[in-house]
């Protein structure tokens, strides 16, 4: 069985157990449902005995002599003490309640006489994890036949009838918060169940997780250790399906898996790592044997449990929790390392040498590793006020108060443990660590410490108004972490003066030390290890001996400046305290700038106190992101369109602004006001119309004059050619000429000279005729009806209750429709997208972070050679250099001159901060759109979560809605993305296994804990110079650090369509793009018969006030009469207006006040109330607010809506030129007819 049908396995409704029809008499009673343990039976017997003895004791005291009362006294005193002692160790209230609930619904699964896991009764099923092998400890449940589901790692069977009352209910409702299980509280957040690390363990598989009502919300399968918390692997329920949540690196929590992998071995003897039974497994009794045991288990998963247990003898006293993590330092010692700058002496071997300095924290705190040990006294005891370091004569001690750390000024020491120091320092170019007891105890190392700024403000300190943002800081806790450092036994130290002679006999006296020797007497050579005095030779001359002091009872740090004793040395590891963890940091919040809203633009006046980042992006298709650091007072103006803009000032929250279509003048006034109004809204359209109108007037006037000239020429030409011909009166009137034979220009000249009044009267006659004709044409034009329809919100009326349509994929923009079905009243329908999520399908390629170069202590072979051996490490390099460290030079202490060899090793691994500070490279595939939609059917409102894929239905009672697929397949994510902290970058990267040195991906691994580490850092070993022991090498700087400095703008700030990018999981929220197809199947129960709804008669509709392009800025009053009181559906059948309310109460008579939104300056729309319709008409004024912080609830008009007043003025303006043109055409036609008739 590869799957479990949801409806049959999990989806059953809870029903009470059926009533039994008969009870067979001869059958024995049902077996007990629970097998009580021996301890529980003893407690029960003891409690019953106490209850039985109490009344008898009272009777004895009253009837008999007091001499018989003493025997029951010890019983009476002993019985109450037992429960009182148990009350001290009882679990908390949350755990007690959970134990009561699960007491009857879970049963242990036994394997080889031990509890391997649990089976749980949920609903009508018995559920047991498939990986939990064994038999259920109940005779009824042990006989059941289980069906296995490998997908969910579960086995299930039907609950026996006699045990149905013991089963628990289950629920799919899981709001974020805390839940209960056997070991306390379980936190549910971001779709994950987590518990504090240590509260769950192998053997808990199958335990249920309850809510506060006692219902099961999940069943535990295992867990994944994530440091301070453990993520649980569970099977849980969603609304319509079963799901399994499996964190990365989760481990099955059956006890059998623990027994197989978690045992340690010593001389073929297996034992639990936290309880070694052997005597040598105690550091205080056998240090060398204990270190060898730990070295053998160096790669064991339970190494640290073994380390903790071997630091104490079985009869020893366990340390307090505050010092438990210091116990590992009992097996270590400080050392003398190489220091680059010891003060006036220059470089030198120093007891306080600095090994490494980290500055990965966002708050500027430094983490320093030194060669001394803090918190451990010289006597190898834990003392937080002491420091021990390696001096010339052995281990020395100093007070912790003498420790100081400084850069350009003294630092604040925040925490110390062992080799590590946490300090908050000022910026500087070097770090100094010193002990004030001796000026020589000082070490400096070059380190560039620059101020770290987090957020968008470079404030020196978070003063004034503050907020907290996510960041990375070093934890001050000393608990176990995944970071560790390697230790090994100290190198062999040359020692002399151990050979003594008595006559010809020579002996070697180690003097309470363990030594290695190699002595030569003639041709005889003796070598070995000695701890007691031994006789070497009987020689005539003194033998030549080379002796080394060996110490295999203690570890020291695996430093590159200290040689190791052997090639395969006894090694161990201890954890590194103060890990880099997720936290929140306080940052300053810059005062908001002064903002001035204008028409289509916003002006900012900045007065920053320190450099502050100002970023802008458009919420349309082209984000056009820009950002700049502002550190001086200045003003800046940005353009704001209808699609909106988003700006971020410093660490303030993002602000989104949208421009409204507003103007300072009205569209219903004089021509100047109208032109100003449309110029504010549509400048290009207005200029185009005015230019076209002017061109029309000029062309029409010029063409009219040309036609008149042509007509006059045609009618006068015949008479001018005939001498003495007299012009008829009709022709003279038609051609505006005199009947005299004199030339026209001469007549005009004569009238201008002698009678100007007659000149003007004759010239005004044709002009008057033209004006009269133009007015007539204008009056005809005014009789034409002018109407322009614009597109508004999608408002439709459907004729069936099975319908398909589309809605905009924009948050807050409603889709409204009226469903009309014959015989039923109209049913209003509204759909609004509340939230949308575009979740891509990701395939993780690898993670990358800062690398750590591991340089083991070099192996130096005096008077001989060494060979390299391959190791399975990333970018591993090994070289052997001969002829190094001349005779007794530096720290090698070799007795040969040119035959000494050094084997240098170096490799790369993930840095200490990799777990908390890393980037993930993903390949992006198809994305799925999930929307949260509020659906209103009549008076029913419900919000549903549905996948917009055209397949997954959303149900509201009996109605079904199928959304999608979306009209345009689009995603803001490229085919490759990089996720770093809470930011997503659309960037390409090198494939896995092909990283380049100094680039992103120079070190790669599948997860932060996997062993498949790949690295390419151009690592090369160099020949060591004479002097101190060291391992020189060259390497390309970290590509991850370079990428963090040079990375581009994250998609969070540069996403188109106003997308909000988030991670965990990677998704884009509330993107404004495309349309969503909707397929609806409305159930009959939602409809109301027409005879049951009011019958309304509408009288009049008056638009009382109207502001266009505003959020429901119009108010219409509709007077009505109705046959009865009831509810009516309200709907607008015109695209020019959107009604706010879908349903309103009606009385027998009255008036309805309806709010509507429109983008038209003069809307004309049809409103339906119940079964009646009426047309509303009104004139709207522009909104006063030019910029608003919300998007318009209606669609903008594709073409400018023109008011009636504007049409009238346009008609007045164009009627005159058109009339002149018409008259000119008529004159030409008449003249042409007359001339043709004469011929």
Swiss-Prot record:
| Region annotated Binding to the viral RNA, chain positions | 78-106
Q: Which residues lie on this side of the membrane: Extracellular?
A: 322-686, 752-756, 801-1216
Annotated site residue numbers, Cleavage? 253-254, 321-322, 742-743, 800-801
Which reactions is this enzyme annotated as catalysing?
Autocatalytic release of the core protein from the N-terminus of the togavirus structural polyprotein by hydrolysis of a -Trp-|-Ser- bond
Provide ranges: composition bias, Low complexity. 38-56
Per the UniProt entry, the Enzyme Commission number(s) are 3.4.21.90
Query: In this UniProt entry, which cysteines form S-S bonds?
Result: 105-120, 264-273, 278-282, 281-313, 339-443, 342-348, 411-425, 471-585, 519-545, 521-539, 715-736, 849-914, 862-894, 863-896, 868-878, 1059-1071, 1101-1176, 1106-1180, 1128-1170
Q: Where is this region: Interaction with spike glycoprotein E2?
A: 147-152
Other facts noted in the record for this chain = Belongs to the Old World alphaviruses that usually cause fever, maculopapular rash, arthralgia and myalgia. Structural polyprotein: Translated from a subgenomic RNA synthesized during togavirus replication.
What is the recorded name of this protein?
Structural polyprotein
Q: What lineage is on file? A: Viruses, Riboviria, Orthornavirae, Kitrinoviricota, Alsuviricetes
